[in-house]
Amino acid sequence: MSLWEIFLLAVALGTDSFSLCVGLGMGKIKRKEIIALSLTVLVYHIVMPILGWFAGDLTGRFLGKVATYIGGAILIYLGYKMIRHGISQEEELPHVTYNLVGLLLIGLSVSMDALSVGFTLGTVKVNLWFVALITGIVAGVMTLSGLLLGRRVSKVLGERAQIVGGLILLLIAGKLIFRG
């Protein structure tokens, strides 16, 4: 694989995270949570292709489906909370919990494609560690960009941003659930 092909692969793998994080960024998210989530996704996108390389196809399919459904359910819940807040004009949006478990679940939900890619990398002459590093860096930057874009859109749209963000999360959840 050429460097250009590796970069395109990394961008393709980072698009789920970018889309999700635009929606999450429209909620109330602190700077340290933005950094923590971006780093979590970066690490997942390094580790998952490596795990995929070693894990095997059967295990990947099983974990992929389970993680996809869990990730979809989490996104439905978050999307519902954001839409409800945007419609009802409650004073404070219930805060998404960015504790260790929350970060790990969000990171897992957007990195399952990277696990699948790891399976296929074993059939191609490529430096797995280099590809995993590039994939992680690109996904981390795309996560950060999505969160920051979501924050900016939220400032422009005000409370309506909660509805838009919630709808984005619901669309992504539907894609996750019905694609798998």
UniProtKB/Swiss-Prot annotation:
Top-level taxon of the source organism: Bacteria
Membrane-topology annotation of the record: Multi-pass membrane protein
Protein keywords: Cell membrane, Ion transport, Manganese, Membrane, Transmembrane, Transmembrane helix, Transport
GO cellular component: plasma membrane
Keyword Lipid biosynthesis part of the UniProt annotation: no
Sample GO molecular function, one term: manganese ion transmembrane transporter activity
Compartment list: Cell membrane
Primary location: membrane
Regions that span the bilayer: 6-26, 34-54, 63-83, 100-120, 128-148, 158-178
Stored InterPro entries: Mntp/YtaF (IPR003810), Put_MntP (IPR022929)
Family stated for the protein in its record: Belongs to the MntP (TC 9.B.29) family.
Summary of the function given for this chain in its UniProt record: Probably functions as a manganese efflux pump.
HAMAP family in the record: MntP_pump (MF_01521)
Name of the protein this chain belongs to: Putative manganese efflux pump MntP
